[in-house]
Amino acid sequence: MAFQQGEAAPVSTQSSLSFTQGFLLGQLSVVLLIGAFIKFFIFGEAPPPPSRGLRASTHRRSNSIFSQDAPPPRSLREKPSTSNVLRPVPSSATNTRSILRKTYYSAIPPNPSSKHRIHHSSHQPESLDWFNVLIAQTIAQYRQTAYLLKDSPTSSILHSLTAALNNPEKKPSFIDKITVTDISLGEEFPIFSNCRIIAVDDPMSDGGRLQALLDVDMSDDNLSIAVETSLVLNYPKPCSAILPVALSISVVRFSGTLCISLVPASTPPLHTPSPMPSPPTAGAQPAAGAQPTDGGDIPPKSSSKSNIAFSFLPDYRLDLSVRSLIGSRSRLQDVPKVAQLVEARVHAWFEERVVEPRVQVVGLPDLWPRMGRTGVRTGDESETGSNTASRPAMSVDMSSPGHLQGDGGNHEEELRFRGLGPRPPLPFDAVSRTSSYQVETGAPRSPSLTRERSLGDDFHMPGSMPEAPGAQ
């Protein structure tokens, strides 16, 4: 018995020491973990955020050549002068080499300093499948609009063509009135492909000018026009003889290379030789730096706008099918000489307008978001009502005279076309709109869209005391 009691004493002492050591070691580890957390997670410096552009793109931008000579950043306390608020644009902002380098497009020739620059691009050509879809939708919309306006006395394509063909300033006196008998706008669409960007020499811009080349092909389409007229013999007396003529012109195939380039607003308009120069005025000659006063030389708008210039290369292909019928009783059908004359005239008309070196310059539309051009998709009435309820302060009075006359006299027609102006009652159910707003369908919207019930009428805080019946 004594021997067993002697063995139990060392075992209890050893277990108490092991418990104390484990307890102290656990407390020390907890203190170290808390200290490391405070040091590295609370007082540690945050790592710089990674650049999303460098992670998403395989290319890495090199430092700009202007980074070494760039001025030091200004302090926020330094107030800029009121006459120069906009920061200056670098001189190389429109340089072709800078634009292509920043967009990762390899279009600069190997030896750009040579006199004759090589017009080619080492970049892979684009297929333009998405562009073909957009162009097809646009052409289809134009065809549908032309058909819907066929009965309009002034806006139809028939009226426009008749007025253009019977222009007294261009039509010869031996041709009687031209009547359009058939018009076909076609059913197919042009196919664009093999788009490439090249750099061409331009003395008006620094480093040349960028130009897009697109191969276009349109074939097997029913694009035609048929007219009837008469050849009048006015000698020895007026209308001494009349020869009826009927023509039908169809486009069999058209293919070529379309050139598109942007003309900045500061660049003067491209010099396009005119086949009919305007006669000089009888007054004194203007000064060297004076502006011309002729209304045909000055654009109607004084605001400078960027323009887009497009043309076709001279190696285009335009195949026409001309059918003719001459005479009243004994008729001559499909005379080869008549077909040659008509084809030569059509080719001359086309080359005088859109074949290099002549280009067509069109002003780019204003893409700045304006409330007058804001529309709502017809299939999102319910979603639009909920979004408008959350933004009642952004409502605009569309029926006020000042708003309709802000951008021009025909602004009301544009709003009606876009579905924003006064319009007749719509066939869809408008209960969802009238239940939230006091707006009558078919009438102009009120200056403020007043809700029938305020949002605070049915709002209750969870756990709040009920209000007294007489409380306001």
UniProtKB/Swiss-Prot annotation:
Single GO MF descriptor: lipid binding
Residue numbers on the Cytoplasmic membrane side: 44-472
Quaternary state and interactors: Homodimer. Component of the ER-mitochondria encounter structure (ERMES) or MDM complex, composed of mmm1, mdm10, mdm12 and mdm34. A mmm1 homodimer associates with one molecule of mdm12 on each side in a pairwise head-to-tail manner, and the SMP-LTD domains of mmm1 and mdm12 generate a continuous hydrophobic tunnel for phospholipid trafficking.
Function text: Component of the ERMES/MDM complex, which serves as a molecular tether to connect the endoplasmic reticulum (ER) and mitochondria. Components of this complex are involved in the control of mitochondrial shape and protein biogenesis, and function in nonvesicular lipid trafficking between the ER and mitochondria. The mdm12-mmm1 subcomplex functions in the major beta-barrel assembly pathway that is responsible for biogenesis of all outer membrane beta-barrel proteins, and acts in a late step after the SAM complex.
InterPro entries recorded: Mmm1 (IPR027537), MMM1_dom (IPR019411), SMP_LBD (IPR031468)
Residue ranges of the TM segments: 23-43
Ranges of compositional bias, category Basic and acidic residues: 450-460
Superkingdom, natural source: Eukaryota
Protein name listed in UniProt: Maintenance of mitochondrial morphology protein 1
Keyword Transmembrane in record: yes
Topology in membrane: Single-pass type I membrane protein
PANTHER family: SMP-LTD DOMAIN-CONTAINING PROTEIN (PTHR13466:SF0), TEX2 PROTEIN-RELATED (PTHR13466)
UniProt record similarity statement: Belongs to the MMM1 family.
A Pfam family that the UniProt record links to this protein: MMM1
The keyword Transmembrane helix appears for this protein: yes
Listed Pro residues bias regions: 270-280
SS bond partners: none
Stretch list, region Disordered: 51-92, 270-303, 370-472
UniProt domain SMP-LTD: residue ranges: 124-365
Alphabetical UniProt keywords: Endoplasmic reticulum, Lipid transport, Lipid-binding, Membrane, Transmembrane, Transmembrane helix, Transport
Entry note about domains: The SMP-LTD domain is a barrel-like domain that can bind various types of glycerophospholipids in its interior and mediate their transfer between two adjacent bilayers.
Residues exposed to the Lumenal side: 1-22
